[in-house]
Curated annotation (Swiss-Prot):
Cofactor binding remark: Binds 2 Zn(2+) or Co(2+) ions per subunit.
Protein name: Succinyl-diaminopimelate desuccinylase
Gene this chain is encoded by: dapE
GO biological process: one example: diaminopimelate biosynthetic process
Associated pathway: Amino-acid biosynthesis; L-lysine biosynthesis via DAP pathway; LL-2,6-diaminopimelate from (S)-tetrahydrodipicolinate (succinylase route): step 3/3
Entry annotated with the keyword Zinc: yes
Keywords annotated in UniProt: Amino-acid biosynthesis, Cobalt, Diaminopimelate biosynthesis, Hydrolase, Lysine biosynthesis, Metal-binding, Zinc
The enzyme's E.C. designation: 3.5.1.18
Organism: Cereibacter sphaeroides (strain ATCC 17029 / ATH 2.4.9)
Family per record: Belongs to the peptidase M20A family. DapE subfamily.
Subunit-level organization: Homodimer.
Binding-site positions, Zn(2+) 2: D102, E136, H353
Keyword Secreted: no
Phylogenetic classification of the source organism: Bacteria, Pseudomonadati, Pseudomonadota, Alphaproteobacteria, Rhodobacterales
Amino acid sequence: MPIDPVALTADLVRCPSVTPEEGGALDLIERILSGAGFDCTRVDRNGVPNLFARWGRKGANRTFGFNGHTDVVPVGDAAAWTRDPFGGEIADGWLWGRGATDMKSGVAAFVAAAVDFVQETPPDGAVVLTITGDEEGDATDGTVALLDWMAAEGEAMSVCLVGEPTCPERLGEMMKIGRRGSMTAFFTARGVQGHSAYPHRAKNPVAALARLIDRLSSHDLDQGTEHFDASTLAVTTFDTGNPATNVIPALCRATVNIRFNDAHSGASLASWLEEEAARVTAETGVEIALSAKISGESFLTPPGELSELVARAVEAETGLRPEPSTSGGTSDARFVRAHCPVVEFGLVGKTMHQVDERVEVAQIEPLKAIYLRILKDYFA
């Protein structure tokens, strides 16, 4: 009997799986997949829940993989929601709740497609599902842990589709063939405290750090590349923690976030930031220290067989030819790319992470149909 992806989405939304809680979501999926003949393994690392499931022979020449997550961000003020954020209620043509868009509907669609496919037309190959409970958090023990375990166990995917929401307005209009890298830089400027009436007796870290931030934010990192828009730098914090208006503080901090294309690496950008900080230190005498966190490098799956496979299936089911894009934030596809070609395609993501997150019910079954067609075409 075919799996209803709408009902499964609602059941998953009712699982309160706010990172790092599993909330019963992976347990539910594991029961469904095990009952359909998938070999399931829980790959939990450092208390983070993950699920690996494979139908077919280990080491098959052709193995199609799906990747997704069941963890969700916090609901915020629950009183601000029109409906129960974990109710999975269907009303007015929408399915409401935290994770409805990001990305329990996508997971439900590919679970349903995978089960129906292997039961109706068992392929000459394998189908693998990697589902994590740690995508919205630090993402260090989620998909990374699954891929580490797979490498150790001799498991592999030939290609992978990540079911994240990718479409801005209409189902079918966009797929992701890559993502920008992300770096957060934390600057700490240490000067000499003093009276504001005698600035020559102090070393003002505020002025020094402001000079550095101005230099960074006025610099064009690049003009974009073949498949990427221009890299961006945004100032996100600037703090002194100084309640006094007549005191030059000794300490000032600032944070910038850089979203970068394939013209850069995290290391090359960190080197540039260090050089700029050193220049300002030389000019002002204020020591400026940098601590950088690279959340992920940019990556690209060049247009080819996988993206064409996805595009044909999307067009056949929706009438739209999806634009291959690298826009937006980062995703777990950045980890998968080191193991096999990866493309992302999913629903419209306009309400993800918002109060009253919801997904249009009429999109969920077509998404399952797209995934099912992709599987059929891949193994044809």
